[in-house]
Amino acid sequence: MRKDEIMHIVSCADDNYARHLGGMFVSLLTNMDQEREVKLYVIDGGIKPDNKKRLEETTLKFGVPIEFLEVDTNMYEHAVESSHITKAAYYRISIPDLIKDESIKRMIYIDCDALVLEDISKLWDLDIAPYTVAAVEDAGQHERLKEMNVTDTGKYFNSGIMIIDFESWRKQNITEKVINFINEHPDEDFLVLHDQDALNAILYDQWYELHPRWNAQTYIMLKLKTPSTLLGRKQYNETRENPAIVHFCGGEKPWNSNTKHPYRDEYFHYMSYTKWNTIGNPAINQ
């Protein structure tokens, strides 16, 4: 990729997670190559006006505005929800359809419960052709592809951080295929991992595998899972020593007082530079 190329980064949040998205954006903007240009997008999962204002004020301190994207929520009326996963989690599926500017060829999607600790241009500049997405294998070592009768082989990716190639995605009508899969399986006992299950069911053989440093999941950071291969164990050690993106997936959120996550202090560090640093944020004030 050219160094003068604009990097397009998108995330999604509801009102409860808007503050954590602010922290993620601060970490990204702080640690990126300052000679590169970035555009930020937020899929609006119901963020209230005051929190939108705080988000915008947070990133404008770095000279970077936010473009908010609206999803047709009717597309996801049959999507399975749970106590900790709302329909907003599915909205990433619509990303290539929400972007009308044909000059934008790809985007990086990053979950809002993450910290970007390395220059994001290193990820942006990766050539992932001929694949549709690039992602990290899910550290839970799930047998979801087999359990969903998709395939007996292949790896299952975590959808929290993805490079999305728009041309490949649109050419294959991936959004339509994923939504059809969701509508065909409106059962929480089937779509156990929600949007991630549906994305994997369609893209299981079309994704480029990234080093786990680019999605340092809680399973890895807390040594809750051990890969079966020597290479896998080596990569997990490298990830713990030097994570590029820390993803606070699962229940070990840094804003919970009882968390054992080793990057909890870094979370509070980046949150201190947001507009939630002292206002109405129990995570900061506890």
Curated annotation (Swiss-Prot):
Induction of synthesis: By different stresses such as heat shock and salt stress and by starvation.
Q: Which domain of life is it from?
A: Bacteria
Q: Does the keyword Nucleotide-binding apply?
A: yes
Spell out the Gene3D superfamilies in the cross-references.
Spore Coat Polysaccharide Biosynthesis Protein SpsA, Chain A (3.90.550.10)
Q: Which UniProt keywords apply?
A: Glycosyltransferase, Manganese, Metal-binding, Nucleotide-binding, Stress response, Transferase
Q: Where does UDP bind?
A: 12-17, 111-112, 247-253
Annotated GO MF terms: glycosyltransferase activity; metal ion binding; nucleotide binding
Name listed for the protein in its UniProt record: General stress protein A
Q: Which organism is it from?
A: Bacillus subtilis (strain 168)
